[in-house]
């Protein structure tokens, strides 16, 4: 019998509803450390995607994207 298997975590943040904290992002990454992604809609109405295997870089990117786009775009954050 195998060990414990974690499912991916996906946070869906509708525009102008708040943000995921640094602490929560770090917890998501610690529990699902096999890669991370974030998607949002930019000022040109284009979907943007950022992927990373580096937790610190990813958390920093998520905080920036939420700050820059959270009031005008839905955001998806994924940890696998």
Regions found by a protein language model. Give the residues of each.
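Extreme N-terminus nucleophile/cap motif
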Residues: 2-61, 75
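A basic- and aromatic-enriched beta-loop-alpha substructure that forms the phosphate/nucleotide-
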Residues: 59-80
């Amino acid at each position: 019998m195998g060990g414990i298997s974690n499912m991916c975590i996906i946070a869906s943040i509708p525009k102008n509803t708040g943000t995921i904290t640094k602490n929560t992002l770090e917890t998501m990454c610690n529990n699902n450390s096999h890669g991370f992604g974030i998607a949002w809609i930019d000022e040109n109405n284009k979907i943007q995607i950022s992927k990373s295997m580096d937790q610190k870089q990813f958390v920093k990117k998520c905080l920036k994207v939420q700050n820059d786009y959270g009031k005008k775009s839905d955001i998806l954050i994924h940890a696998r």
